[in-house]
């Protein structure tokens, strides 16, 4: 039962429920009901037009004039998958389409209903309610209800009791901890024990911990996790460092992106791990000892204007970078800690999924942000020194080394400058540094490398690093720190550099207050160059303006982060209050302006601000949101106010804004456009090719390489010009024709220290917004904004999505040429039909590919030995090191691990070095070529290498091939016909499996040859023929040297290589005979089924496929043609129907449902191949039953089945809130659900679904062993984060009550492999619990049963491996078994145990016939019943206490006494394979 362990055995529990009901008690969910009125995400839906609230009444919904917040039937909440849940009905709001009525029916439905009709967009929900309720205007209304259609249509809907719209209470993902779902978010609502839960619950747990299911039905899938809890202690799930009081949570069992991990920590009142001291690093290293993992920490470089920082605002003063780290900071912006390097740090791509570490300080969950404080003291300083905040400062203009500068300061009685706040930094940049570009400060790491400290011995409490800093550039001992640039950012530099410096020393206290008043009136506070006054009356906005004017001042303006820090300090003690500023949206246009008319160059918005409504005035918040800006109603909201009176020069906006202001008369670079009223030029970067689309950070990098920025928008006029520019390029057509065409703009909320608020990447203030009214906008994930071509509004998007983009550049500025450095060949070199250019400067693979595209080229592909030799000869001329690596265009996709050329050409030639390519993995791999050996290898794509571009007139990309001509004729008996070819699979009998040449000879004897697969359609036919094939099959592809070709030299126009293939032919003794031949894989793993692999032609035996043309003298087979629309098609016990007519996705679903079907579910590559033939036959893309949540790229089947198999086109799924279809080439693509496609595939229901095998018993679910995963009759616990010897693995599993992994059949092997493959970065494999029994001369499992199933990898199991000294393991990357030594080797551990049977009451025992015995039994039963009643009441009270947040009874701890053997396990989500098994 997964997380559920009943407090009582099943029979007394049901009996007890009856007794309690008789006694007036009710077993329910006290936490759910008691907290209902306090839940902030629950609301009432109010209709302005009907003057009533929406209420669920049975299966219908009505608008009731009396709104009652305590009535569950009127209480609603948004839940996952964009559904609206009613707390009274415990159902979801939806629509239905009765077969006898064309009117859509609004009502309440079970939340697991298989239809998209339960999903709503919050921005259009009101309109939909008006339309659907208005359709019932003529129906008879119940007494007390109002259903006036005209009123409803014209009415406005909002949250009752507030001015908030229906999008104001969105649903946020809740990420689980522990359990067996590796951190996957809760599915809300979920069903457990035939009841629906709309939030986390402790039901079913004795320990009172809150949990949730991560799929819709817990009873079906048994996937679950604990819910995050914000508490002030570190009792549960945390380790506590007694020395520092910091608490740590290691989530080895979870795999989330950086932003998701950050959100998970935040949901627990914590943050991702920060490490600020050597002691802390040492403590963390101790907790990681014995583990193998890479984990997210809070280190990030997500602020595009700043450097590396901690997400919890800790100062970045200690670093533990590994050698050559950080690398590729432009695209890898998040930090990890690695056990492999003993706690060293690396930077990674923030979007990959990894385990993570949280950190928190107990009793510190709700403290407000501490602003910079101002010392109210006056000091005297020596001549040439300037006073500020109790200290004196002096600029030393003479250029010296850092040490010489320090000695000079010491001679003057001070030390090099230390900086402890933003206010002090402002004083330094404005008053002391002035026009000096760069100078020394006292920060250094001379005592201990990468442990920065101030030379005056003061505590490092504040840091302000420059972008990409500190980096200890190329390990060049940059031990001293400079301050430079207009923002005063910091950079680590070599200490012997000669620069000016600033000295600092304590001032002499004098009488009076600091700075006097500088002319400010009494009660006002001076901050250069103005006086500030806090108005303590709570007034509306117009009164605040008038009151400031009466004092000869204006409402406060805030033009940079320094002024923001000062104003925050003024209001620090006013917790819970708001203060008006001079910022407002005057004309309700969405454009904010200062009352003075100045442009907004700096903003500091709170989360979800300025919101989506137009209009409003801006006030400063206090408390935990100290100083953050929020939009309030100007006429009804009352707040205090801040007046500002300027005494000096006009305020200078903070850089980096567009400063200096660009000219209106400057010209635009070629290809860029502008308007006479605008100061910038604009260019759209758009391509049909997915390879040329970019993530947000990549697009930003492209713009900046050109000397431009991603588009920022400051006004409606600027956006209107951009809209017209897009319309000229893409045409002014209907919005649906532009659906899902998005362009990156510079707006983002990537920086965790900005409180989820939006910022422009070029530093422009966020004063104008044009967001589409987003629905269920998950702030934790979507951190970048796009401009939507269809609506010309903005949409929040996940930053790693690959899209087009728009750049802007100031008028009069020239576009920079690509910075490609010194080039060995300045001209293109021609060879055969192509031209090549060799770039000697080093770039990452992605940057190299981008530079190639600037020349209308691609990174080079290689298709022959002659081309390889040509490249090698030129590389040797340019390479000083003959082992120099050069990038070429071969790379893998993150989605499937398959190699492909960047120019889209087929892989017909390989030249791998020995041992290459490395085993496939999750990370993208890119391929290099060495200069001298001319061989290839693969490595991380972010490595900087020289590279080669190639361009030719012919495109290498493959497109769908035309259908072969319809040829009359048929096939002989025993052959299967497809179009104009006959096929025959041979090798069912193992005796018939032969070497490649023998297979070809056998085909020739049958007047045929080994199969040639010319296009995806033929591949689909063959794959669809494989379900009953249990062996690999030779095909006609072979390689004699390094190139592959078909028999009879047919051109190789199509390939279907498996992930990591082809690995290349072995060296041939002679150049004539093939040494590497291709097979089609039968693998039960969906990633490999039907794919090609190259094998030894002479050492391996396999089945094979023969092929020949049809015989005109024979009649064609009825099954030879492609499927026709309208007909029912049967395949693998499934039935499909093809629809061919223009349909939107929802229309297709309705049409399928009207025919007792649904849009098709594609569970495996066999069904995919079958449907590929259907799409190709109709020459049209076909809708399938796959759709995403609104605003998300997470796609799921209508049937709620997990997406275990996918056939996405490269770069897909691209669209958020979209629907999926099978394209004519068989791949899946996504588009707007409102797009009209030319057809769909229905999956026809034939009676009730086949029964699912149910297995008795459950898996352990305690806090310390919660990650057991059920599969068939057993439970499995994966410990890939632990590396143990074979003996230790046996001991660990024995302590858990199980055994080391045994694998009894291929299905179980695939199940295990799916888990290990996802965690291969932690462990190369896991131990198998087998050993050699010398008495029987055989391998046996731990229970001494013989090993009857095996999956040995090449070269197989030799006699030398059959001994007591041999141990055996399963490889993470391939699922193959390997023999090896038992000692000095560590592997991951997988423990296995049978499901635990639950002891239940057996009702078959009859009552005794003896009356005395009967009395005794009845008396005992009554006593037992009373005891159970008492126990139940105690349990009920305990649960009530637990559900109020008390975890007093929980004593889980992963403390120092519990080493890795007792640690929480790292797990990967299991596929629901067991759910699909059918009884034989």
From Swiss-Prot:
Domain of life of the source: Eukaryota
GO CC list: plasma membrane
Processing after translation: N-glycosylated.
The keyword Protein biosynthesis is assigned to this record: no
Annotated Gene3D superfamilies: 2.80.10.50, Fibronectin, type II, collagen-binding, Mannose-Binding Protein A, subunit A
GO-annotated biological processes: collagen catabolic process; endocytosis
Cross-link (Glycyl lysine isopeptide (Lys-Gly) (interchain with G-Cter in SUMO1)): 1141
Disulphide-bonded residues: 53-67, 92-111, 186-212, 200-227, 265-358, 334-350, 409-503, 480-495, 617-634, 703-807, 784-799, 852-949, 926-941, 1077-1097, 1219-1233, 1367-1382
Region described as Disordered: 1446-1480
Extracellular side: 31-1413
Signal peptide: 1-30
Domain C-type lectin: residue ranges: 243-359, 388-504, 527-643, 677-808, 831-950, 978-1106, 1131-1242, 1271-1391
Comment, domains: C-type lectin domains 3 to 8 are not required for calcium-dependent binding of mannose, fucose and N-acetylglucosamine. C-type lectin domain 2 is responsible for sugar-binding in a calcium-dependent manner. Fibronectin type-II domain mediates collagen-binding.
Assembly mode: Interacts directly with PLAUR/UPAR and PLAU/pro-UPA to form a tri-molecular complex. Interacts with collagen V. Interacts with C-terminal region of type I collagen/COL1A1.
Protein name, per record: C-type mannose receptor 2
Organism: Rattus norvegicus
